[in-house]
Amino acid sequence: MTMLRKIIGWILLLCIIPLFAFTVIASGKEVKQMKSLDQVLDKNIDLKDISLVQNSYMYDRDGSLVSEIVSDHENRVLVPFNKIPEEVKQIFLTSEDRHFYEHKGFDFMGMVRATASNVKDKKIDQGASTITQQLSRNLYLSHERSFSRKLTELAYSYQLEKKYTKNEILEAYLNTIYFNNGVYGVGSAAQFYFSKPLKSLTVGEMAFICAIPNNPTLYDPLKHFDYTKSRQERLLKGLKDAGVITDKELKKAVKQKIKLDVEKREDKYPDYVSYVNDEFTQLVSESEGFDKRLQKASGKQKEKIENELSARVSTLMKDGVKIYTALDPYMQNQVVAQMNSKLPYADVQGGAAVINHQTHQIIALSGGKNYQKYDFNRAYQAYRQPGSSIKPLLDYGPYIEQTGATTSSTIDASKFCSKDYCPQNYNNRTYGTVTLDTAFKNSYNTPAIRMLDRVGIQKAFSYIEPYHFAKLVDSDYLLPAALGGFTNGMTPLEMTKAYTTFGNSGSYTPSHAITKVTDLKGKTLYKWNDKATQIFSVRTNMQLKKLMSSVVKSGTGKKAYFNAPYIGGKTGTSNDYHDMWFVGLTDTYTMGVWVGKDTPTSVEYLHSISPQLSIWKGTLQAAY
């Protein structure tokens, strides 16, 4: 009975089609007095502009492709109508819709033939769908085979024909049809199956990929190559019969050996790409005012704005954008290699960031040892206690700026207590009066506490406000912060960004991975627009660089030293050896390295080998 109802439905559909067609083309007085079909369809079927999901692209500093980003699992490279080879157009016209340029969205005689066949075979198999109907189905409807869906498809097809030219419909169709394996459109099919652009395919190769959409599962060349080849030959014969190619060209195309070269999609630099995706959201947020709205919002309102931002970013990615970055592939490979080779024990991890402080560009990132795509990225997601690496920013910098001290100025390094807070030097040692140079390169704690206490907590913290440490909270404004005691801490990237101040005469400009974002036609959509902030005077900055130079020459960071125009930095160790840091700079680069365990526990057993220092040295030495 079910099959009988379906067949009767098709017969009824055939009866309705003439009435439908008559209403479309009639101009009689009686019809004009009726409410027009156009008005009914316009009211009930709102055709949105054809907007196809497209791939987005990410490039390194030299313009080489780094990553192709597929949205909604639709791998699509949009090819304009005038760039689609004539052979491809003709293959689909001859095989799918010979009367495409003549009908108004549906082919009545074709449906008669299909219905007769369905009645004869007692099944709904042939639908005689035109290219316009197929496009309607791909864009707006399901692929269910039923009478009601078919009638709806006709209405949508009629609307499409009203709104778009035939060439626009054919272009959209050729960019929406499915080629299996997550591939949509003729452009992506050429790239996926042959690893070359559509225009570079031979006629035989074009016909081969064009064989797939008729039944993507059956004609999947990765699983059923012979089936695909057989259909390719039928399509080529159809081209010859239509006069598109000659008999000689047919024989040559059929004879050509098809060699698939399936595109290998791999992110060579997952650590860096992961961050760029995050920074892209930041860039959109700042450029379109989401950041200011988020600062004022809270609770459900904040969540709503965050969802709006996420939707906006998703839309941009679906529309297709080109993201240009400062990625230096050589330095990226260096930092990844160092991280993978210098961290012993399976549970020991790390994160690192490398910035060219002359250009304010993030050129390399390591998200961790043996980092894989979608892993937790420790370079920018791991908030850890910075230990003594905070001292140049929060203690020594403000103190020298406020007092006019120099590296040879002296300070008390004896015991210090403020109420119940009595910090100790390493190994509980006590010292007398020492120079700032001695205190800094040996990382004495009590002098740093005294500096913060002398300057004043509020005043000292004002020096680090321009860095916008994301998880700095009010409860951090206490003396323990002088030694890196924060509620949440900082990420390796945050610390590295802050240290670029020392490479720029005390001036700070935020560093970024993204240099610009354009649409697929090259129009610039977004660029960072940052302003410099003078954190320390040139004089203070010179003193700080001298102090940091002493660290690598004769202090706690000696293992990081190599021959370069300038090297300086600061080590850092948090309480109970949960975190080990080295953040430093050369004349060109600033780099920060953190080593520890994801679940904070002691790594004191690594103190003697100091992997954070060897990773830092191994990475930057390769640049000189």
Swiss-Prot record:
Gene Ontology CC: one annotated term: plasma membrane
Annotated localization: Cell membrane
Gene3D superfamilies: Biosynthetic peptidoglycan transglycosylase-like, DD-peptidase/beta-lactamase superfamily
Pfam families in alphabetical order: Transgly, Transpeptidase
Disruption phenotype: No visible phenotype. Double pbpA-pbpD deletions spores have greatly decreased spore outgrowth and peptidoglycan synthesis.
GO biological process: cell wall organization; peptidoglycan biosynthetic process; proteolysis; regulation of cell shape
InterPro entries: Beta-lactam/transpept-like (IPR012338), Glyco_trans_51 (IPR001264), Glycosyltr_51/Transpeptidase (IPR050396), Lysozyme-like_dom_sf (IPR023346), PBP_transglycosylase (IPR036950), PCN-bd_Tpept (IPR001460)
Entry keywords, A to Z: Carboxypeptidase, Cell membrane, Cell shape, Cell wall biogenesis/degradation, Glycosyltransferase, Hydrolase, Membrane, Multifunctional enzyme, Peptidoglycan synthesis, Protease, Signal, Transferase
Family listed: In the N-terminal section; belongs to the glycosyltransferase 51 family.
Protein known as: Penicillin-binding protein 4
